[in-house]
Amino acid sequence: MKLEMICTGEEVLAGQIVDTNAAWFASTMMEHGVEIQRRVTVGDRLEDLIAVFQERSLHADVILVNGGLGPTSDDMSALAMAKAKGEPLVENAEWRERLEDWFTRNNREMPLSNLKQAMLPASAVMVDNPVGTACGFRVKLNRAWLFFTPGVPFELKHMVTEQFVPFIRDEFNLDSKVALKKLLTIGQGESALADKLEPLELPEGITIGYRSSMPHIEIKIFARGEKAIAVLPRVAGHIKMVLGTAVVAEDKATLAEEIHYKLLNSGLTLSVAESCTGGMITSQLVDFSGSSSYLQHGLVTYSNESKVRVLGVNPSTLDDHGAVSIATVEEMAKGARQILDSDYALATSGIAGPDGGTDEKPVGTVAIALATRGGVYSQMIKLPRRSRDLVRSLSAAVAYDMLRRELLAEAVIVDYQSIGRFSK
């Protein structure tokens, strides 16, 4: 099966918005063992839409079209599809009734413009949208099925998961026996990871893919077929052994997610004191429901005064060692833990750049500490030639990994290939 995607919208074409729908769709299809062969972006011009539908339908087996199903004049996907096939738009009575019911239930009067959303190409098969007013549909043109979906991400995800994936499995007799194992890594580049993994002799049906989402690189191990699925745990275990300390989580999207579930299930508590990461560690944990059960407080102590007054850092420590130092970050972590008697506390202080570095402490120097009931672990890492955002996100990831290793009773301080460290 040859799968393609057509993304519509002037704002997408002009780069005014980032097309997260395309990234999500491609990733989701990969998890089902299907690779997108081509993606095309086209603006809201009728003749361009008609042309791309006609052209790509000669080459693909199925095309997911995203966007252009709204009620406004620049929503042209249905009309363009009808013209591409040489048939009229007709009102879908079922969807009109759904629209009227939706507005009634929400105590709103339906604008006449919304009736446009019930107008589908004559040969279209309606595709349900249980969470919005944009009617999905599919049409056969030349060799391809074109599957039309709304641009609203929440609606797209429902339609792809509940309608599109079952459709292509049935229509193209796809093997549903596909399993996926994800390994999340930090501290090594994609090429370095590939150098270690590509020499491996993998069993038939096992393939490896890489996805860079800094500060992480995700390794996806696909198993297609019953025999490959049976050996997937063994293969994944061997890959973890080969990569060593680079692997920080399994089947999680982020290291923050890994930490969230470990703390949630342990009953242990955490406090955070952040300087250069500016609340990033705390914010990433709060993204997950239930974090209030373990996250006692998150403090952004950016100034030296706040480090002294809020966390109890000794002024002489700052005078003697500076804000970005092992001594200071250890006192920050101890102070944050003691405020509410947390089981653990993380602290960061660094120079994220692009200014502020010195010969002794260049941009990218970050001190990180983990305070426990039994003591404090600390390190000062080097992240040269990284952007400000990447310095902050990598620092947060290293802090998380220190806590993760402590929770697993492993060595808290480890070497990462692409992250340097100052000697104490």
Swiss-Prot record:
Domain of life the protein comes from: Bacteria
- Classification via Gene3D superfamilies: 3.30.70.2860, CinA-like, MoaB/Mog-like domain
InterPro entries attached here?
Answer: CinA, CinA-like_C, CinA_C, Competence-induced_CinA, MoaB/Mog-like_dom_sf, MoaB/Mog_dom
- Coiled-coil regions listed in the entry: none
Its family remark reads: Belongs to the CinA family.
UniProt-recorded name of the protein: CinA-like protein
- Organism, as annotated: Shewanella baltica (strain OS185)
